[in-house]
């Protein structure tokens, strides 16, 4: 019987370790740094109020949003889906430029963005403006996931 090449053994070990590590990683919130900055600029609520809100403002799907604010996040997710399927964008890892006047509903995505960056920026812009007009219900923050079936 032939001995296994040490380099192959090393690669096999690395793959096994990475698979074991990946299986223990809990689902992560979406990479939404620019969206967080838009919220921070236009709203006096803290970002943490919107993380883990309802069914759509977290990394889970649902049949029905729990309220208007959750509908804003549902629309953003649908916009991101369109960005991927129609435009080939990667909205969860994409950085873009935008301008904002602090605590105003004046957000501008027209900077020197590519078509994808501009599209994703406008997904976040629309969601941010929607959130500004939606009522925040603290009972929908950190809700039981069973409500999102």
Swiss-Prot record:
Family from the record: Belongs to the phospholipase A2 family. Group I subfamily. K49 sub-subfamily.
Subunit structure: Heterodimer of an alpha (Kunitz-type) and a beta (phospholipase A2 homolog) chains; non-covalently-linked.
PANTHER family given in the database record: PHOSPHOLIPASE A2 (PTHR11716:SF94), PHOSPHOLIPASE A2 FAMILY MEMBER (PTHR11716)
Extra remark beyond the main annotation: Negative results: the heterodimeric toxin does not affect ASIC2b, ASIC4, Kv2.1/KCNB1, Cav3.3/CACNA1I, ENaC alpha/beta/gamma (SCNN1A/SCNN1B/SCNN1G), TRPA1, TRPV1, TRPV3, TRPM8, P2X2/P2RX2, and 5-HT3/HTR3A channels.
Descriptive protein name: Basic phospholipase A2 homolog MitTx-beta
A Pfam family recorded for this sequence: Phospholip_A2_1
Organism whose genome encodes this protein: Micrurus tener tener (Texas coral snake)
Database matches in Gene3D superfamilies: Phospholipase A2 domain (1.20.90.10)
């Amino acid at each position: 019987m032939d001995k296994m090449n040490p380099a192959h053994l090393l690669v096999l070990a690395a793959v096994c370790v990475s698979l074991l590590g990946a299986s223990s990683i809990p689902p992560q919130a979406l990479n939404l740094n620019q969206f967080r900055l838009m919220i921070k600029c236009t709203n006096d609520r803290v970002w943490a109020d919107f993380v883990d809100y309802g069914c759509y403002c977290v990394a889970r799907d649902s049949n029905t949003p729990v309220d208007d604010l959750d509908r804003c996040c549902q629309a953003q997710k649908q916009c991101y889906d369109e960005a991927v399927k129609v435009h080939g964008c990667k909205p969860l890892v994409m950085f873009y430029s935008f301008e904002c006047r602090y605590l105003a509903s004046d957000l501008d995505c027209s900077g020197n963005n590519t078509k994808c960056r501009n599209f994703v920026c406008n997904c976040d812009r629309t969601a941010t403006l929607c959130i500004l007009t939606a009522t925040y219900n603290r009972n929908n923050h950190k809700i039981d996931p069973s409500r999102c079936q």
